[in-house]
Swiss-Prot record:
Amino acid composition bias (Gly residues), ranges on this chain: 69-85
Entry PTM: Predicted to be exported by the Tat system. The position of the signal peptide cleavage has not been experimentally proven.
Primary gene name: melC1
Protein name per the record: Tyrosinase cofactor
Disordered, as annotated region: 65-85
Pfam families: MelC1
Signal sequence range: 1-30
Keywords: Copper, Melanin biosynthesis, Signal
GO biological process entries: melanin biosynthetic process
Length: 146
């Protein structure tokens, strides 16, 4: 039996470390309920869009759902001038007590809102909950369109 050397130990560790991301990758494709979604064109969950939600959190109704391009805020673009187009949340809208909470999906897949802009979270549901926590009972005011 060959003697265990530092070189062989480091080589074995590198092989194991290289395999870990391959095992973790399929888990990253699960939606909010932990179920894997089929890769079907037009399926919002398959394209990375989070699942819709509608719940009462700390006495506030929070909702989230996908939106179509025609239903974007600000008349289809930033300030109604056609610039930007659609939601910053990549076709996803979040509401607190019926008032839209502006959310944005970051390049790394995390989400931020206009209320908790410097605290990224994993899902729009978590962004809505963080906003309710930050509001501390105050009413969410509509975001100005210009």
């Amino acid at each position: 039996m060959p003697e265990l050397t530092r070189r062989r130990a480091l080589g074995a560790a590198a092989v194991v470390a290289a395999g870990v991301p391959l095992v973790a990758l399929p888990a990253a494709r699960a939606d909010d309920r932990g179920h894997h979604t089929p890769e079907v064109p037009g399926n919002p969950a398959a394209s990375g869009a989070p699942a819709a939600f509608d719940e009462i959190y700390k006495g506030r109704r929070i909702q989230g759902r996908t939106v179509t391009d025609g239903g974007g805020h600000h008349g289809g673009g930033h300030g109604g001038d056609g610039h930007g187009g659609g939601h910053h949340g990549g076709g996803y809208a979040v509401f607190v007590d019926g008032v839209e909470l502006h959310v944005m999906r970051n390049a790394d897949g995390s989400w931020i809102s206009v209320v908790s802009h410097y605290e990224p979270v994993d899902t729009p549901r978590a962004a809505a909950r963080a906003a309710v926590d930050e509001l501390q009972g105050a009413r969410l005011l509509p975001f100005p369109s210009n």
